[in-house]
């Protein structure tokens, strides 16, 4: 497990336990901005999860389209779900 994923899991846990209180949301936005600056593939993969958690469905879908492995069934399924959300919700 990489450092980005560890940090995401911790922030996600805080977000869910506090039911999205402002401090946990701010921490996620700060982490999102940090990941957006990184060129690391692992950071981009975690960024998809952060976008999804923060309801940036369109951004999550577009990023996963760019970096996702289309031969992986799990990725294809997630792309389908995110595409539906992106079309109906946007960001």
Predicted regions and their residues:
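Generic helix N-cap/helix-start motif at coil->alpha-helix transitions
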Residues: 3-10, 39-44, 74-75
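Conserved small-residue packing positions in alpha-helical repeats and bundles
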Residues: 8-15, 48, 65
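Boundary/linker segments of alpha-helical solenoid repeat arrays
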Residues: 19, 42-43, 72-79, 90
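Helix-turn-helix repeat elements of alpha-solenoid scaffolds
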Residues: 19-29
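Alpha-helical solenoid scaffolds that mediate protein-protein interactions
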Residues: 27, 31-34, 67
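TPR/TPR-like (Sel1-like) alpha-helical repeat modules
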Residues: 61-71
């Amino acid at each position: 497990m990489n450092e980005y994923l560890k940090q995401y899991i911790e922030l996600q846990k805080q977000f869910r336990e506090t039911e999205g209180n402002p401090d946990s949301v701010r921490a996620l936005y700060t982490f999102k901005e940090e990941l957006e600056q990184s060129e690391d593939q692992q950071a981009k993969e975690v960024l998809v999860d952060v976008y999804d958690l923060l309801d940036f469905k369109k951004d999550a879908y577009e990023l996963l389209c760019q970096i996702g492995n289309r031969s992986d069934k799990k990725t294809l399924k997630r792309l389908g779900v995110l595409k539906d959300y992106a079309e109906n919700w946007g960001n």
